[in-house]
Regions:
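SH3/SH3-like (including bacterial SH3b) beta-barrel domains
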Residues: 217-231, 263-294
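SH3/SH3-like beta-barrel superfamily modules
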Residues: 230-258, 281-314
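Active-site neighborhood of divalent metal-dependent phosphoester bond hydrolases
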Residues: 2-102
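Active-site micro-motifs of SAM-dependent methyltransferase domains
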Residues: 1-2, 31, 119, 154
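C-terminal functional module detector
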Residues: 194-231, 240
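Acidic, His/Gly-enriched loop-helix segments that form or flank divalent-metal centers
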Residues: 73-174, 181-185, 197, 202-207, ...
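Conserved strand-to-helix beginnings and helix N-cap segments that scaffold or border functional pockets
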Residues: 3-7, 159-160, 187-189
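Short, basic/aromatic beta-hairpin or loop at an interaction surface
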Residues: 205-216, 252-269
Length: 314
């Protein structure tokens, strides 16, 4: 739901399920299986709003891609009944596949769930609370089995340094793996590698779409820095520039330069995309993913950590 290829991705997973032994858990952005043939006033409003707002600004989402494939023109007057009939007839396998996904998968050693496990008796859990369970690692919960979750980008748990790698909390037995792929400008897709021998020596395979280059000269990192992120991203513009603007983070009073294109909402409350002024410690020969190329230097990512490099790249 956070990119232009949701329908293609769904078809890829359906094909993968036919060929190999794999399992999927349902997430809150995948919960469309009962939206195609059950007209209800509240649901009708939600579907229309979702389509007309381009998946809340993250689209086109899965339903819009289905509408495009079916030739349905989405506007404020589009026929919701025709929408249900057409998509239900054209994509029955897709909706059935989504409906077949469990919200929780439990094994002898692991529990897999998109958002997190609700509190209380599992017999009374609501599926939606398993799929959308914000800030699960911040709830102070502890488990006997490893609980592996996504949903809440790991960057939101960090401090003044932005890291997209999974967080493995060995005290609570929670692993959060959402690297903010597509949702974050510097996000990545994380795959947690679980050892066959049942040990806790977890591995990581990560992907991002950025070009990879090599550092030519070493750079000392550190120094004062901050990481402004979603949920706490209100800023005051001190001076505006064409490429960079000087801003003050409203909650902390911290001042930094950020890319002007990261500012939004300037007619009222001004906010910014996730940004940092962290200077990465790097050695000559280190490989980095280049997120932004600017007149001052490069916003890069090295081993999952985002920050600035002010030297030359090969």
């Amino acid at each position: 739901e956070k990119g232009p290829s949701s329908l293609d991705t769904l078809h890829f997973l359906m094909d993968l399920k036919e060929r190999v032994n794999c399992w999927f858990v349902l997430g809150n952005c995948d919960y469309w299986y009962d939206e195609h043939n059950h007209s209800m006033p509240c649901r009708d409003w939600y579907v229309k709003d979702y389509l007309l707002t381009n998946a809340n600004g993250n689209g086109p989402g899965l339903l819009q891609q289905m509408c495009d494939a079916a030739g349905i023109v989405v506007d404020k007057d589009f026929d919701i009944e025709n929408y249900y009939r057409t998509l239900g007839a054209m994509f029955p396998r897709e909706f059935e596949f989504l409906a077949s996904m469990p919200q929780v998968i439990e094994t002898d050693s692991y529990i897999f769930v998109h958002g997190g496990l609700p509190k209380g008796d599992p017999g009374h859990w609501d599926g939606w609370d398993c799929m959308k369970n914000d800030d699960f690692m911040g709830q102070g919960r502890k488990f006997d089995k490893w609980v592996i979750v996504g949903h809440w980008p790991v960057q939101l748990y960090g401090g003044d340094v932005c890291c997209a790698n999974p967080i493995i909390d060995r005290d609570s037995h929670i692993i959060s793996i959402d690297g903010g792929c597509v949702l974050k400008d510097d996000g990545q897709l994380n795959a947690l590698v679980i050892p066959h021998d049942g040990s806790d020596d977890f591995g990581l395979i990560a992907y991002d779409p950025f070009p990879v280059r090599r550092v030519k000269s070493a750079q000392a990192g550190g120094g004062p820095s901050t990481y402004i992120r979603w949920g706490d991203n209100q800023v005051e513009i001190l001076s505006r520039g064409g490429e960079f603007s000087r801003v003050r983070h409203v909650r902390t009073g911290y001042e930094l330069d950020i890319l002007t294109k990261y500012l939004y909402g300037e007619s009222g409350v001004v906010r910014c995309n996730d940004c940092t002024d962290y200077v990465l410690p790097l050695e000559a020969g280190d490989e980095v993913s280049v997120i932004e190329t600017t007149s001052r230097g490069y916003l890069v990512k090295h081993e999952g950590v985002s920050g600035w490099y002010y030297g030359e790249l090969e």
